[in-house]
Amino acid sequence: MGSDASLLPGTLDLLILKAVSLGPLHGYGILLRIEQISGDALTIEQGALYPALARLERQGLLAAEWGTSENNRRAKFYRLTAAGRRRLREETDGWQKLVTVMTAALNATPEEL
């Protein structure tokens, strides 16, 4: 699990929303899911994750309830709200458009100009 890739501003929230969209998770589970879906390219520090989770919950993008984790410990499980699903869709569309534009720009050749 390397941290070779750096997070761009605003991407942590998007990654959290995506991770939770795949199923309810507790905080540590979200860290592991982000590592998994990024092919172990991204490692999120707990010190960054938990303030982001609190912020997303305050914004109404995540809902949380207490439950029992797989190792029988009390944990707060997060799930997407309807507003969270909308935000994820909007942010995903925006990033996909940006990737398309940047790919075209970076692949430009003198012959195309």
What kind of feature is each model-predicted range?
Residues 57-74, 79:
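Beta-hairpin "wing" of winged helix-turn-helix
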Residues 86-113:
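Amphipathic alpha-helical dimerization/coiled-coil segments
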